[in-house]
Amino acid sequence: MYCLPVFIILLLLISSAPSTPPQPRNKDRVHLISLLDNHKQILQRDWNSCCGKNPGCCPWGK
């Protein structure tokens, strides 16, 4: 007899819980890819400035 009110309260709580629409998986992957591309561009810029001043610090040996 005590279970019925608890069950009804749980049903009301579940139905009133906020629901978020599912996000597509590709959106997260696109952000990750753009983050990695930005990281590569920053490293390339740093290497270019280093190679202009000191060719010995270049990773490709210019």
From Swiss-Prot:
Molecular function terms from GO: toxin activity
Post-translational events: Contains 2 disulfide bonds that can be either 'C1-C3, C2-C4' or 'C1-C4, C2-C3', since these disulfide connectivities have been observed for conotoxins with cysteine framework V (for examples, see AC P0DQQ7 and AC P81755).
Keywords: Amidation, Disulfide bond, Secreted, Signal, Toxin
Domain remark text: The cysteine framework is V (CC-CC).
Residues of the signal peptide: 1-19
Positions of the pro-segment in this chain: 20-48
Protein name as catalogued: Conotoxin Im5.1
Source species taxonomy: Eukaryota, Metazoa, Spiralia, Lophotrochozoa, Mollusca
Sites of Tryptophan amide modification: 60
Protein family according to the UniProt entry: Belongs to the conotoxin T superfamily.
